């Protein structure tokens, strides 16, 4: 009886030990997996000009902040920015429009990433994430990828365009041209009115002649 009790007690201790090891393994796996998801990754974006970009400039994906600029270097022909995406769980399609825009009352510059295609999460290379060695840089932006950016909405361009338009209106040749165009349009409208009156008179004359013929 005592031997049977000892065997049962040993089996109970073994089951508790295995259960504890299993729970500890699951907890460690969740912690490691969650930590991996929160790891940041970087990419490089080349622009023709800085366009107001500086360290700390926000990087947005579909309008939401996902990272920032952490470094800027200058070459003879372009500006190379280093961006940091806060979480490796942020998957960015490779076919995306990357442009600088100015927002707010202070015209703060931001880098907007606008995906131009949808991703299929069935691909293992996409599930692996941008930090994985199996990351497919033809589908998504992987860690340390090199990208090309463009200039987007810029208030300096708007001011220059407005200045050019105002300068055009100050040109006397433009006013002479508009005056000549308006004069020709008035002449055409007068001729059109005369033509419609003549057509009306002719139609009235024809109708009267037809009525006379019917009466005869």
Curated annotation (Swiss-Prot):
Subcellular compartments: Plastid, Chloroplast
Keyword terms of this UniProt record: Chloroplast, Plastid
Listed GO MF terms: lipid transporter activity; phospholipid binding
Family annotation (Pfam families): MlaD
Record carries keyword Kinase: no
Lineage: Eukaryota, Rhodophyta, Bangiophyceae, Bangiales, Bangiaceae
Cellular component terms per the entry's GO annotation: chloroplast inner membrane
Superkingdom of origin: Eukaryota
Name listed for the protein in its UniProt record: Uncharacterized protein ycf22
Chief site of localization: plastid
Chloroplast found in the keyword field: yes
